[in-house]
Design a protein with these regions (language model features):
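A common structural junction motif
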Residues: 73-79
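Short S/T/G/P-rich N-terminal loop/turn motif that feeds into the first structured element of a domain
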Residues: 1-52, 61-70, 82-105
């Protein structure tokens, strides 16, 4: 069974620089460390600085849905000013150039 990737994004109330976004993300990142079912999270900021979010790799959709609760969505809206958008995608294969391998997830 392949892992599930969740692409979460939200519109920001005002333009953010990369330094501002990094500081903003550092404030929430500790809560994701050692989170059950979460394998990896990459934060992102769009080039125009108006949209941000995260790309999460989960063991399963169920693990992701245990986190993306009504309360979590309300937290995101209160912190960033807009509702998060969540897109789930299957990730059957990984090309890892750092390790020089291709593997099934």
């Amino acid at each position: 069974m392949s892992k599930i990737m969740a692409i979460v994004s939200f519109k920001l109330p005002q333009k953010q620089t990369l330094d501002q976004a990094t500081a903003m993300f550092q404030a929430t990142s500790p809560k994701y460390l050692n989170m059950p079912g979460l394998l990896r999270k990459n934060y992102f900021l769009t080039e125009d600085g108006m949209r941000a979010g995260g790309v999460y790799l989960w063991e399963s959709r169920q693990a992701a849905e245990r986190v993306y609760t009504t309360e979590w969505k309300a937290f995101v809206k209160s912190k960033y000013g807009n509702d998060p958008e969540i897109v789930f995608v299957d990730t059957p294969l990984l090309v890892d150039n750092e390790r020089g391998r291709i593997s099934s997830l």
